[in-house]
Structures are given as C-alpha cells and as structure tokens.
C-alpha cells in the first residue's frame, strides 16, 4: 500500500506542474468564479501533488469557500473505491514491454544503478512501468518524507462539509495522456532526468517553495522550459485537457456552486483554466493569499 500511495502521488505530480505557458500575476492559489448568470460563485484551487503531510493546509479561505459550495470536483474522484489500484494497473506497459527493451544497455545500467544507489529501490519491481511515470519516482526523495495528498485532504474536508465528490476525468483519461507520448520519447526523458538529477532536485525544491508562497508567476517562470524537448507534450499534458474540462466546469458551476481543485499548472497560461473561463465571460478573481 505504501508504494501504491507513493507512486500515485508521484504520478499526479506531472499533471500539476508541466509547462504552463503564461503567467498569472496575482499571488493566489484560490480563485473565485462568478458572473455569466451564475446564481452563486464557484471556486478554483490549484493543488500540488508532492508535499509533506505537515505542509498540506486547508486554509480558512478554503474552508469558507467549501462552506459556500455544495460539491467538490477534482481531476479524479479520489473517493472512488479501488482508484489507486486501477491507476497502478493502468501505469504498466502492455504486451510484455519493459524498460530494458526501450533503453540501450548503457542507459539501462545507469537506471538500474540509480534506482538502487539513490532511491534504494530495485528496478525489477517497476520494470514494466511506463517510462515517464517511472521518472516521477525520482522526485520523491527530495521531500524526505512519505508524501501526503492534497486531494485526500480535500476529500476529508468535503465529507466534513457534507459535500459530494466528483472527478473531471477517469484513470483511463489520465493514462491516455501519457500514452499519446511515444515510449521512446518517454525513455529519453527518463534518462535525462537521471543525468540531470542534481538540477532536478533543486528545481523541485524551488517549485515547492514557490507554491507555498502562492507565487504563480514565479512558478511559471521557473518551469516554463520544462520538458521542451518532448514534441506536443504541453498540448497533451496540459492544454488539451484544459479545453476538455472547460465545458464540464461551466455546466457543473451552473448546476451547483462547486469547489474545483486541479493541479496548479492548469491555472496559468493562454489556454489555462483561468484564461479560458475569463474568455468564456466569467469573472475570475484571486482570493487574497493568506499569510
């Protein structure tokens, strides 16, 4: 169960912070959605999927927003039974493909040694995992803790507020995002992550710091160049999903005031959720960041 929770946290980390394309100047992770005929406002919150449990905070502003809404909508319905097992199963390659078959002997040895020496994990146990998902495991030691889950904390808060929980996507939807990127490109990213691991560790720490200060603009500037070598990655991992979510968010907000929570990387950019909602005619205002 521990490895399942760890990998789930790492898996969803990529969806939080991959290459947002434009900055939001306001320092806030919580946004109020109103106008365009909405009887009551909804709220949009940007999550991070790699955080030590003691750093996960449901703030007073978030509590107030949840009190003013009737349902919680996440990327995935984390309250659904068996979702972690489903995600683990879907993260594995099919038809007997393994990471060894995708790498040169030299790169495979590099990966095997890295897993053993730096992570204390045998590669054999994860050899069938899709390369890009395997690379997320490298991020975990930076925290020096067993990651907590903002999503599960929000689910717990929703239960306390007697709110229903729903998801914008299914596990199959999220895995399909990775499947749109060729395995060879994923493998190249995996090897690059190892060779540049010291730099990667610093970047992750900086991203977490920027998140904690709610500096979305600074976060954007830091990660804008990430994964640039992977063709169409930004569209597959971020923009296409935002566009798909927009009608769902609109319809849901019209039906009931809703607390939406998605990866923070989805908020910014010319095709980010905030901009898309504004272009659709809604008022989207930053809720003042709490100290």
Q: What spans do the regions from the language model cover?
A:
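Bacterial Sec-dependent N-terminal signal peptides
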Residues: 1-26
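Short, low-structural-confidence N-terminal segments
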Residues: 20-39
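Short secondary-structure boundary/capping elements
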Residues: 25, 54, 240-244
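Structured, acidic catalytic/metal-binding patches in enzyme active sites
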Residues: 33-236
């Amino acid at each position: 169960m521990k490895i399942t929770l760890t990998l789930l946290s790492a898996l969803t980390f990529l969806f939080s912070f991959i290459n947002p394309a434009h900055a939001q100047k306001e320092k806030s992770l919580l946004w109020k959605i109103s106008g365009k005929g909405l009887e009551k406002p909804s709220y949009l919150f940007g999550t991070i999927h790699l955080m030590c449990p003691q750093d996960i905070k449901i703030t007073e502003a978030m509590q107030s927003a949840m009190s003013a809404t009737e349902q919680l909508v996440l990327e995935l319905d984390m309250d659904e039974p068996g979702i972690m097992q489903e995600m683990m199963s879907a993260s594995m390659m099919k038809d007997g493909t393994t990471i060894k078959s995708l790498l040169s002997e030299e790169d495979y040895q590099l990966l095997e040694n890295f897993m053993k020496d730096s992570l204390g994990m045998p590669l054999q146990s994860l050899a069938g995992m899709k390369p890009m998902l395997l690379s997320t495991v490298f991020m975990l030691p930076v925290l020096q803790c067993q990651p907590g889950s903002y999503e599960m904390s929000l689910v717990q808060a929703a239960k306390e507020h007697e709110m229903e929980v729903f998801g914008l996507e299914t596990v199959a939807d999220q895995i399909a995002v990775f499947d749109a990127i060729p395995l060879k490109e994923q493998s190249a990213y995996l090897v690059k992550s190892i060779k540049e691991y010291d730099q990667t560790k610093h970047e992750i720490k900086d991203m977490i710091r920027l998140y904690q200060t709610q500096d979305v603009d600074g976060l954007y500037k830091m990660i804008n160049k990430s994964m640039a070598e992977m063709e169409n990655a930004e569209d597959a991992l971020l923009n296409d999903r935002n566009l798909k979510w927009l009608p769902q968010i609109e319809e849901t907000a019209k039906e009931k005031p809703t607390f939406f929570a998605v990866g923070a990387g989805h908020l910014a950019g010319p095709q980010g959720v905030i901009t898309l909602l504004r272009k659709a005619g809604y008022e989207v205002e930053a809720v003042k960041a709490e100290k």
